[in-house]
Amino acid sequence: MRIETKVEKFNEHLYLESGRLLEGFEIIYETYGQLNEDKSNVIVICHALSGSHHAAGRYADEVKAGWWDKFIGDGKAIDTTKYFVICSNNIGSSYGSTNPMSIDPSTKKEYRLKFPVLAISDIVKAQMKLYKRLGISNAVAVIGGRMGGMQALCYAIEHPT
């Protein structure tokens, strides 16, 4: 299974449900499998509150595999020989995307307790900006457990395609 980890940096504002904004943000994400030419084989995986973008596979220096490794991979339920699977780290998470320990561009200091409160729709909005940048306009499925399931529901309501 082909695994790639990448980071996308966004310089635009992300307007949040709370009325606050992030003045730019970063999203780290992993992909599994190969995106086909017309980008019609995408499956989006959304992680739980304590999860990360590392949903499957194992790196040489890791003791355990990604949190859904039993389900994602060549010949598995989410078959990476057929589908291009993408799992982005939620903004606000401590696993590489913009979070309370990130630098606030307006103060040049870590956000810490000044990091804005996020709604599920804020996380989805940030992810949609990532998919737009990658040229992905729809997905075969959006799947997630626990908080990831809440994100999947938000996609179904706010972005049904």
Describe the residue ranges of each PLM region.
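Short acidic, low-complexity segments enriched in Ser/Thr/Gly/Pro
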Residues: S97-V117
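A structural signal for short, well-ordered beta-strand segments and their strand-loop junctions
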Residues: V44-I45, C87, A141-I143, C154
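Catalytic-loop region of hydrolases
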Residues: M1-V42
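Conserved acidic catalytic loop of the alpha/beta-hydrolase fold
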Residues: K108-K114, S121-A141, E158-P160
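Catalytic nucleophile serine of serine hydrolases
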Residues: R146
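Short glycine-enriched nucleophile-adjacent loop
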Residues: G149-P160
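N-terminal cap/lid subdomain of alpha/beta-hydrolase-fold enzymes
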Residues: E30, Q34, S40-S102
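A short acidic, glycine-rich active-site loop
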Residues: W67-I72, R112-L118
